[in-house]
Amino acid sequence: MDFLYAAELKKKFVCFGHFYELVLMNGARMKCRSVLEIVDAALVPETPSAISLMKPDVVVIMMNPGSSHPKDIYHLDDEFEYPRANGSLRKQLVLTQPDNTQYQVMRVAVSKGWNHIRVLNLSDLRDPKSGSFLQKAGELAGVMGGHTHSIFCAERAEECSHSIQRSANTPIMLGWGQDPGLIPLAEQCMRRIGGEPTRTVASDVHPVLNAHPSPLLQAKKLQWLETMIQELDA
């Protein structure tokens, strides 16, 4: 298959994210992103936040938002506590610089003819370093309400149910990687989406882990793409 580079993909797709600051009962604040909406540039509505209420062509679940950030350097994050008093499912979306891993998702979308991809994560915590991220996630497990950094927790069931709806019965793509530290979050995710069709590039490390979509070597990136597309076509 043709390997489209980031410069080409940026012309075809626009990315919008919902960024927020998770406020915990102990006063701690965590920088988060709850969703990334990848949309064909020709189909972006006049009010981008309306995208959050649309059904995408496909949903992808990855590890965490990585280095993704708002393009507007002056953007102020919403403050969230869970459970939320205002249960609106509409999210304030802003133009977003995606993490490099998302370009792999865009390549799959081009191959499949998809125009709207919704990316969720096992955790909303924004951290580009997986070791640091896993340490934070582990620490939050011991904090009252700390587990709500994951959209797959019980308190966010309605938000999750809405977010995984697709316009067609496409499988949910899974690509959060093979770090054993992810197993608790991955198991929670699989319980929450139980019964939904899924596709992944399998890992031999653990049944709930899978190959990372964007390994360092381009040959490995191509291998992941080809395998995922084969799985989706199966």
Regions found by a protein language model. Give the residues of each.
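Active-site and ligand/interface coordination hotspots across diverse enzymes
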Residues: 1-91, 233-234
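Conserved acidic residues
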Residues: 57, 115, 168-172
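Short, well-ordered beta-to-alpha junction loops that form the rim of enzyme active sites
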Residues: 62-63, 122, 175-179
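Histidine-anchored nucleotide/phosphate-binding helix
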Residues: 73, 80, 102-108
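A short acidic, glycine-rich active-site loop
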Residues: 85-99, 143-155
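Acidic, metal/cofactor-coordinating or nucleic-acid-engaging core segments within structured domains
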Residues: 88-100, 106-120
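Short connector loops at secondary-structure junctions
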Residues: 114-134
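Glycine/proline-rich loop-helix segments at beta-alpha junctions forming the active-site rim
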Residues: 127-234
